[in-house]
Every structure is written in C-alpha cells, then in structure tokens.
Amino acid sequence: MKKFGKKVVLVGDGSVGSSYAFAMVTQGIADEFVIIDIAKDKVEADVKDLNHGALYSSSPVTVKAGEYEDCKDADLVVITAGAPQKPGETRLQLVEKNTKIMKSIVTSVMDSGFDGFFLIAANPVDILTRYVKEVTGLPAERVIGSGTVLDSARFRYLISKELGVTSSSVHASIIGEHGDSELAVWSQANVGGISVYDTLKEETGSDAKANEIYINTRDAAYDIIQAKGSTYYGIALALLRISKALLNNENSILTVSSQLNGQYGFNDVYLGLPTLINQNGAVKIYETPLNDNELQLLEKSVKTLEDTYDSIKHLV
C-alpha cells in the first residue's frame, strides 16, 4: 500500500453522506474530500456550499465533486449510498436491493486501482461489509463497517441521562448486529467502576429500567425514522469518529463491524465488537467477557446474520 495520507472519497450524497461531509469538513480531518453520487447537481451544490464555509474549518480542506477514478489514490472510501430504510422496515429487509447497489459501487471503486480502506454505512451494514470483503478480496482489517458505534453511543447517552453523569463517563457497549438482534453488555457496563445494571436495579427495585434503556437504544432508529424520515446526524458523527481513528492513527477501541476469526467460536461473520482502530485498519478484536445470557444472545445475533448472508451469497 502507498503511504497513508488523508484523502477521503464519499460515495453517496444523501442525508447521511452530506451530514458526514459537513462533519468531516468542520473537523478538517481530511486534506482532500471527494463526493461521488449519481445526483451530480446535488453534489456540485454541496461542494460549493462546503467549500464556501471551509475557511472556518479547524484545518484546510479541499472539497470536490468526483468520479470513481478519484478512488485510485484515496486512503479511505466511505459508502453511505443505498436504498433508505422506510418506516416499519427492518435493516435486514433492505438486504437484496442494497447488495446489488453495493456490488455496482465496489466494482467501480476497485476498477480505479483503489488500495485503501473501505468504511461501510449502508444497511444492513454487517451483511454489506462482509459482502464487500468477499467481493474485493481485500484483507478483513481494511474493510470496516460502522457496526454498533452509534448504538453504543445511544446506549451510553441513555444511561448517562438516567444516572446524571456525562456520556463519556459511561463505559458500556452494544455488540452484535446493528439491528434488532443487537445486545447490551450489561455485565461489563460501569460508571466509575460500579455496575450500571446493579445501580439501576437498586434504585428501581427491578430490572425494568435496564430493559427500557436497552429497548430504547435498539429501537431508536425506528422512532426517528417515523418522525422525520431517516437518521443521519448520529450515524454521520459515528462515521466521523471511525474516520478520525483511522486517519489519525489513534489506536482507539470502537464497536465497528469487524470480521470474526475465532472470537467466541465464530468465523467469517461481520458484527459489532470492540475493535482496535489505527492506520492499519481494524487490527484487533477484543473478546469482551460475556455472561451466559449474553453469549446466548450473541449466538442468536450471529445466526441471524449468517442466515441473512446465505440469502445473498449468489450475488458474490
């Protein structure tokens, strides 16, 4: 691979993509930011809008409209393009139509001579990230999904509101599928080293509050989609966080969608787990200790993803 730099190409200039572009320009994380979308007039307008305000970015950044050949020397290609999730529709129900869209995009990116990292956000993200890895033949550490990074942020936010602390003081994760089979790792969730689950149970006299927090985390996207059509600010900031960890060689641990290689006894499947992210990609999955119930829920999540992936294997 070439020397790691800071050129990012975004494929997909819808609500998620444009929100991510704005966040990236605001933070000045990339030196060059390229946007690709079939809606070329929209891209041109967004490029102008972003460049007009780039003076006030934290560091210089050039934004431009591009084509797939721009991926040739990109360090990171972020794919947000895909059919949106409709009210009442699960992420897994999007699978076949978005797999076909993804195949077209990834083929065009690879035809450019691309030799960088993929960051996938289109849903169902765990399935599509695995699909991109299989189609491209790239090493697993260079094909990363947004996973449960946003879910974990939602989880930490809801806990923080309940306990009256900042989100950054809450150490807790959502793992598994970015979707209905995701699970909360209550056995490890803590604030100041004290169990969140036990604290909630002591304060309320039951586990109802913990269950409510989990359900509100899991179903957050459905509520937002019902009210305003789609989610985009939260996932855009999650993508920003992952991009920053990659581009700035942070050695940060984030619950991205990574490919399992023996962890918890599973192989090949992609799902959200605490993963070390640096300039070499998703370099290490941390096998968080889980209790028996959590292990059963993880197995269920893996089975859900495996069954769904089997349904689109013919498209590889």
From Swiss-Prot:
GO biological process: glycolytic process; lactate metabolic process
Protein's UniProt name: L-lactate dehydrogenase
Cysteine disulfide links: none
Pathway: Fermentation; pyruvate fermentation to lactate; (S)-lactate from pyruvate: step 1/1
EC number(s) given by UniProt: 1.1.1.27
Entry similarity comment: Belongs to the LDH/MDH superfamily. LDH family.
Self-association state and partner proteins as the record states: Homotetramer.
Stored PANTHER family: L-2-HYDROXYCARBOXYLATE DEHYDROGENASE (NAD(P)(+)), L-LACTATE DEHYDROGENASE
